[in-house]
Amino acid sequence: MVLHYPGGIDLTEFGIQIPVAPDRTAQVLTALRDDPKIGPREARWLLGPDGSEIEQEDLLRVHAPEYVARGFGDGVEGLMLEVFELVNADGSYHRYDPDSARRSLAELFADWRRWMAGTYQCGSEALRHGFCFYLGGGAHHGHYDFGHGFCVFNDIVTAIRRHQAEGSVRTAWVIDVDAHKGDGTAALTADDESIVTLSIHMGRSWPLDLPDHRPDGSPTPWFIPSTVEIPIEPGGEGEYLRRLDEGLALLDAYPRPDLVYVVDGADPYEHDGLPSTADLQLNLEALLARDQRISSFLDERELPQAWLMSGGYGTRAWEPFAQFLRWRLGGG
């Protein structure tokens, strides 16, 4: 199943100039609809919103009350400026032109909550059907009391904890193959034995090039390791798939999960448009092998798998997602 929330989030509407192609989901859908085997079966694999919503109580299972309150009060615009890193230290704007905005940052927060609901629904569909790919989700840089890297709240942990509260899930895995370390997910679940995390990521790039201590001397949380941590050094593309296989094998030592979220970032792609992904340059063949290995690993163990788009920037970001879904849906 493929889950699509029409509209999505177009950052340019808010004056934000981060290079996320607003039409990457549309391009994926076009590629699937144009496939001679997949297109005629659209009614069997394409899903829309089921009305799920993310409420304050869902966020409070994961995030600090004072942080959640900022999103629902007068501090929402300041929150969005911080999380999307739109203001430099000297007060000037960074990748942000408020004069070009057609919608307010408060509206972006409302869109974000709607976007998060898709991650929860994706998990529900995976529990029902065995597989679901959400054309959205994957905000793995959301931390307990702050967000960075364009991630306001952590939709992955929020969805898992809601499923746990509802009794549909006891244990879960998160397999994160985005180019950037899933630092928020690792930090939020570090003391939670019910959630096992794997992250394979650039070993020296953002957020791992940020300071390891705050001005007050306390450690910063982005260095907290995932349960299975796989840093790839610059130039390590040739060992990527082998190290992924080794990491997946380690998961078998942990309790069998009721649900697996896969954070399927396309930003390791050699044609990605975000400068901070330059240390990991995989071609389409390697990215397809990555996704096939994860999907087959989970299929062999009959584990429900909920896939999230996560990172992927520039005009070609849709290509890795489309090729995997063509394979998964039995395309020509």
Predicted regions span which residues?
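HDAC/HDAC-like amidohydrolase catalytic core signature
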Residues: 1-332
